[in-house]
Amino acid sequence: MTMITDSLAVVLQRRDWENPGVTQLNRLAAHPPFASWRNSEEARTDRPSQQLRSLNGEWQFVWFPAPEAVPESWLECDLPDADTVVVPSNWQMHGYDAPIYTNVTYPITVNPPFVPAENPTGCYSLTFNIDECWLQEGQTRIIFDGVNSAFHLWCNGRWVGYGQDSRLPSEFDLSAFLRAGKNRLAVMVLRWSDGSYLEDQDMWRMSGIFRDVSLLHKPTTQISDFHVATRFNDDFSRAVLEAEVQMYGELRDELRVTVSLWQGETQVASGTAPFGGEIIDERGGYADRVTLRLNVENPALWSAEIPNIYRAVVELHTADGTLIEAEACDVGFREVRIENGLLLLNGKPLLIRGVNRHEHHPLHGQVMDEQTMVQDILLMKQNNFNAVRCSHYPNHPLWYTLCDRYGLYVVDEANIETHGMVPMNRLTDDPRWLPAMSERVTRMVLRDRNHPSVIIWSLGNESGHGANHDALYRWIKSVDPSRPVQYEGGGADTTATDIICPMYARVDEDQPFPAVPKWSIKKWLSLPGELRPLILCEYAHAMGNSLGGFAKYWQAFRQYPRLQGGFVWDWVDQSLIKYDENGNPWSAYGGDFGDTPNDRQFCMNGLVFADRTPHPALTEAKHQQQFFQFRLSGRTIEVTSEYLFRHSDNELLHWTVALDGKPLASGEVPLDVAPQGKQVIELPELPQPESAGQLWLTVHVVQPNATAWSEAGHISAWQQWRLAENLSVTLPTASHAIPHLTTSEMDFCIELGNKRWQFNRQSGFLSQMWIGDEKQLLTPLRDQFTRAPLDNDIGVSEATRIDPNAWVERWKAAGHYQAEAALLQCTADTLADAVLITTAHAWQHQGKTLFISRKTYRIDGSGQMAITVDVEVASDTPHPARIGLTCQLAQVAERVNWLGLGPQENYPDRLTAACFDRWDLPLSDMYTPYVFPSENGLRCGTRELNYGPHQWRGDFQFNISRYSQQQLMETSHRHLLHAEEGTWLNIDGFHMGIGGDDSWSPSVSAEFQLSAGRYHYQLVWCQK
């Protein structure tokens, strides 16, 4: 029967969720994940424990607009209108309430610690049976791995406890509440709590029991905590595994702890000791603890390159060997320290090839499953990432085990962000909020400190710098001196961080913001008295079509040893699947659920789409981060390994020499390179081509054998060089045919055989082409100076907030999008063997000339049309996005063939990963389906393009798809795009870079802006 102290009314009156001093009630102390094996062999092999029972599955659920609307009767029995939902899940993904996407602005009125009276509340209940033996002895716990944002728990009508911090476990002792037969859990989850003020991360705001729920049965006398650490001699030839074990229960003389260390099936070391801790101070030590030290000779060291894993089994038993319970964890022998301004792993300076990762799934919201986690890790490893930052909260417990075993360095980050506070450190400098912050930091450390993959602790994200940070920094350094601590808030270089860890600092450009300047990363290292390493906690904002200038960072990382890399923002687009009226899925972003406030598509900054399909930018990241570097001198290739610990034992170097994409010679050489070593490869005498063209040498590093994270044939690195070619002059082919010019009042018409070209004399544009009776154009060939805005072009501009510095606003204000052509010249001349059309246009807006474009079209007897373009850009207009031509072709061909850089989309400031070759792709693959439509699909360095009956030659950039720039610009979501008639072709002589240092300020480097004032390009258009 429910007692008065268990009643819902008492809980509602107490309002624990509006008290920063109450972060939990009756929650058990933090510890590493437990399984309570009763067989040490099962613990060693990590088999499922019979003492750990999942409660995942279907639960009863009722949603209420506020906790006060929940009836008292719900504590005892399910309500008649209860629905069924799957746990774990976010209730917004089941149609209850709406997810809210906001970056900085809090989704509730800022009045800490109070939350709105309309506080959506989810009431979960589950009826389950308990094993009879669990009731007879021992302790039965319930573990909630993640509940957003706070909850009260009842069991069989009796109140059990309260928990908040949505990203760490809340664990309660159920022993006194359980009974034989059926038992009923009731969990009241509140969407908002005072904890929400500490969880203002840039992500969807969702609610519910979104991580696993389980029951754990422990013996009455039990292991309550254990911590393992590794120590080494100077050359890492000898190690000590230090294990501190703590017990709970009756402290009996006969109790013993045995710690055994295993490498596969082999026991490496073992030790046994009674309880009784080492002397701490004048009052002695802890009677319920013991520290064992196991010596290990020549340990196999752990790193992300070679994740050697041992297994430590901790047995609590009696003196005669009777096992009470066993716990276990993976062990990696590794040492992390900072020395002489460098972050070292096992004595070697790390280069962090990192990425920030939110826990996100397009169908399941913030629910993570093992398949998705493994998929993320495999993709990261395959694309040369070696590190991940858990942005911005502790992740699902399984994530760390997977990172241990596959090999990724982890920055484990506390669930603290107060980005929307003014000032930002309003809470983090307030002692009333220290208990809440302390719980979030200390419990993270106590849960995760046994994982070798965790090499850095983070105090949180974007919360200013307050006294609470300093206190928690000191606590971590006291409890775990084996790892550095980082924290970006307050300027990235405060006393609360061992690492200078700025976000979006640029390579050479200072950003002197008041109070918290962002110096260039090169300058930061040289500031007076600054001796710390610099690792960017966020950089290269990968929003939409982005990552321009990424190579510049990596040039700096390799040039300056204390610039030790960074973490790209971020891994995965946070779009969510919605369904239209016909049941078709589409990708939604902020505002699509009627959510306010919202930050629109700013939730989509990923290197991969939400379904984990790669963005083209991922290839650029892979190439810049590759572990092999190459240098060509004559016929000698020098290969340098950037692996710190791994000897190349599964790599072949394939080389190919090709002329305009046609292979002339190739070979294969095994790579045998020591860590940080070099290998010199001498190529044979290379063939000299007899015909004109571009001669390229391409090398690929291929892994012939499958690995834990890649299939056989995986390409891990590549490089290309253009070789010197013999001078070759191609004489024009003599043609006896002469094109015929006909002049009318409206047009110039040129005919040659079955081909015709028509130039409109009033517009001055090529208005139509015919092959036989078939028209080739749906729109005239016109100049183009604009692009459908990228996220980086838009910046923070939106309907209600205009950023006049954003590229798109500057282009709009100058009239680039509205410019109209005024004809200055349109003449035709018949030459001895060709017809020459000469045109000139002034592109104007509101009477002001922005661009002058002069063109000649020379149509010769072979049917080739040579187009020469000269453009002048007005000195007082913004640098244009592109200088090129556009038209709508009538043809819709299946495939596109080109000689140039590819195969993936590339742009002038994001093309180091692209290779020059002859490429052939389906037309559909030439379009990149960014959820927020924008300019996409460009291919640079093109010498020849073939599409349908047409061929273009020259030196240009192009994109080709069924969507016009106008449609891309006017459409909010990709699923709303419709394939237009024909095919849109954009051929650019010049295209501005895309930028990507960040997405809220102009970030295209000066060398990739179109600032010259005068431009010249030419191409040939013919029919095959």
From Swiss-Prot:
Top-rank EC class of the record's enzyme: hydrolase
One GO location term (cellular component): beta-galactosidase complex
InterPro entries: B-gal_small/dom_5, Bact_Beta-galactosidase, Beta-gal/glucu_dom_sf, Gal_mutarotase_sf_dom, Galactose-bd-like_sf, GH-type_carb-bd, Glyco_hydro_2, Glyco_hydro_2_AS
GO molecular function, one term: beta-galactosidase activity
Coiled coil: none
Segments passing through the bilayer: none
SUPFAM superfamilies given in the database record: (Trans)glycosidases, beta-Galactosidase/glucuronidase domain, Galactose mutarotase-like, Galactose-binding domain-like
Record site feature (Transition state stabilizer), residues: 358, 392
Entry cofactors: Mg(2+); Na(+)
Any Gene Ontology biological process: lactose catabolic process
Catalytic activity, EC: 3.2.1.23
Binding site for Mg(2+) 2: 598
Keywords: Glycosidase, Hydrolase, Magnesium, Metal-binding, Sodium
Cofactor note: Binds 2 magnesium ions per monomer.
Binding site for substrate: 103, 202, 462, 538-541, 605, 1000
Residue sites binding Na(+) per the record: 202, 602, 605
Positions that bind Mg(2+) 1: 417, 419, 462
Keyword Phosphoprotein: no
NCBIfam families registered for this protein in UniProt: PRK09525.1 (NF007074)
HAMAP family according to UniProt: Beta_gal
Subunit structure: Homotetramer.
Family: Belongs to the glycosyl hydrolase 2 family.
This protein's name: Beta-galactosidase
